[in-house]
Amino acid sequence: MRSSSLLARPTVARLLTTMSATTLPGDVKVTEHFLSVPLDHSKPDGGSLSLFVRELVAASKAADDLPCLLYLQGGPGFPSKRPAFPPSGWDKSALATHRVLLLDQRGTGRSTPVTAKQLLALPGGPQAQAGYLEHFRADSIVRDCEVVREALCGGKKLSLLGQSFGGFCILTYLSLFPDAIERALFTFGLAPVGRTADEVYAATYKRMEERNRRFYQRYPQDVELVRSLVAGLHAAPAPLPRGGTLTARRFLQLGLLLGSASGFEALHDLLELARPPSADGLPDATSSLPDLFLLEVEAAQQHFETNPIYWLLHEAIYCDGGGGGGGGGGG
């Protein structure tokens, strides 16, 4: 039986604040909105969250009755993209015909955030933490979008653009409120409907094997470098400049970079920072790793601290009905 939160209808929003509009380069009028939404849409009189939406419109068309395009960011656990001005890419194309709404999904960015400190402070331990995080899944995000549609678009149908996990949210939106959507555009992020999370894992392993093979084919000089670093970190984990420890296992998690289009070069450039200024260019167990390398490792892995939803709910986005646990890629 479905939980009440899955069956709940979104509530009417309370528009907390609309900031003064600003016109930026490229003739774009930018308005920032804060809305109040329930933590649990099935219990509208319970706790609430603040939701942040940045609205973009061509200044010359600001008074026109334009349709809305809502952008759903990848993740889970990441705020909406911050646009460049003057606009380019899809932003520029969309602004020719639409008002563009950039939503910081609940728990991210300037919406009420989820933080490690906040979760650890919840009374009730891990069970309470898991219960709280249940309210930050796609079903709640979609109900927030319905609140945004009513408050900022006058209840008119939305066009949706979903990046990665944003596409997962679109599928949930189409399942729950199909009549609210004019059109839905996916950029990656077509969820593996009908497949268990374990099957996603298996496919991801094969893909990562191939990405690793291609990486070392492109940069064969990194084979011995990585082996040397792993051996050294096994023998003596390295303290990181801002706290924490770089173990061999944590170092190998840098392989996540291989999942992006520019990841091969990003990983190679980072590894190069670990090379000592010597003829063979390989670190040994007796030498300290360069501070710049350690700082860049921290920067590459900062999402552990800044985007906890990604690490805590990432696997859950692949659950399909009563399927197995686990999860794979995304982003």
Question: Predicted segment positions?
Answer:
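N-terminal mitochondrial targeting presequence
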Residues: M1-L16
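Non-membrane alpha-helical secondary structure
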Residues: S4-A8, V200, R218-L225, G259, ...
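Alpha/beta-hydrolase fold active-site neighborhood
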Residues: P237-G331
